[in-house]
């Protein structure tokens, strides 16, 4: 049912410095950047088919770490996690594409045992 880790999100204190660091030292390439709700800046970097999501909050807080798992059967995955008693943090919803060649997708967010966010993408 689950295929792979789609992306990992890291909160950083200086978005430009972190983008430069991951591009220069690890070969990542930034492909999209935007300002999200609440003044959070987000930059998406790729290395192969792996995405690193760097976020910076204007208030300096470092909350909301998460990772995302891609699934072949979104509705089945959601049903199984709910059946297993996994707490849902955000209901299933559609998201827009982050780049022109990408299609939007369905996503849902669950919580792990320590409150960590586990995003499921289908």
Q: At which residue positions do the language-model features occur?
A:
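Core segments of cupin and vicinal oxygen chelate
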Residues: 2, 9-51
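Vicinal oxygen chelate
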Residues: 4-13, 43-46, 59-122
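Structural preference for long, well-ordered alpha-helical segments within the folded cores
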Residues: 20-21, 80, 114
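Short, charged/polar, Gly/Pro-enriched secondary-structure boundary elements
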Residues: 50-53, 115-116
